[in-house]
Swiss-Prot record:
It holds the Pfam family S4. SUPFAM superfamilies: Alpha-L RNA-binding motif. This is Small ribosomal subunit protein uS4. The lineage of its organism: Bacteria, Pseudomonadati, Pseudomonadota, Gammaproteobacteria, Alteromonadales. Signal peptide: none annotated. Gene3D superfamilies: Ribosomal Protein S4 Delta 41, Chain A, domain 1 (1.10.1050.10), RNA-binding S4 domain (3.10.290.10). HAMAP family: Ribosomal_uS4_B (MF_01306_B). PROSITE patterns: RIBOSOMAL_S4 (PS00632), S4 (PS50889). GO terms for molecular function: rRNA binding; structural constituent of ribosome.
Length: 206
């Protein structure tokens, strides 16, 4: 399945919530009607079946983290093998992706931009260049911007925007040095309450 390259706001309207695919401090509900379907005169969304709700939740989370279907299913399988709550394990695995950590630290304005920074070899983990967006970051790993990439305007702009947002408690960032520490794996209470991971577990358990 190919990665979606179309309008980002359309995806958020389809899911009925801000997927954080656009940069900026304001939520996008001020720009578009999230309760309506995509399109200039989008009708209100029909009531979904139980399966429809489960599928929609999976699509929403997959799009938030920018993960393709096969990869997302693999994350679920890994989450199911781990001890504890499968849904919570799934979200924690997604949060440890390098592209997501780069975004959480504010080096990229969006996860898509952060993924690009990783792919273009602008990111280092513990002093070594890593260009795999799905690379798993561990607690206490240090993530930094490569020296030759520190003059990029988009990184500076992203850090300025990030300075206006509430910073995640599980990362520690030194904006001047353009580096941060991944202090710990986030708890479920740290993450968005708008995600209902149990629906995803129910979908894949069928």
């Amino acid at each position: 399945m190919a990665r979606y390259l179309g309008p980002k706001l359309k995806l958020s309207r389809r899911e009925g919530t801000d997927l954080f695919l656009k940069s900026g401090v304001r939520a996008i509900d001020s720009k578009c009607k999230l309760e309506s379907a995509p399109g200039q005169h989008g009708a209100r969304k029909p009531r979904l079946s139980e399966y429809g709700l489960q599928l929609r939740e999976k699509q929403k989370v997959r799009r938030i983290y920018g993960v393709l279907e096969k990869q997302f299913r693999n994350y679920y399988k890994e989450a199911a093998r781990l001890k504890g709550n499968t849904g919570e394990n799934l979200l924690q695995l997604l949060e440890t992706r390098l592209d997501n950590v780069v975004y959480r630290m504010g080096f990229g304005a969006t996860r898509a931009e952060s993924r690009q920074l990783v792919s273009h070899k602008s990111i280092m983990v513990n002093g070594r260049v890593v260009n795999i967006p799905s690379f798993k970051v561990s607690a206490n790993d240090v993530v930094s911007i490569r020296e030759k990439s520190r003059t990029q305007a988009r990184i500076k702009a992203a850090l300025e925007v990030a300075a206006q947002r509430e910073k995640p408690t599980w990362v520690e960032v030194d904006s001047a040095k353009m580096e941060g520490a991944f202090k710990r794996i986030p708890e479920r209470s740290d993450l968005s309450a708008e995600i209902n991971e149990q629906l995803i577990v129910e979908l894949y358990s069928k």
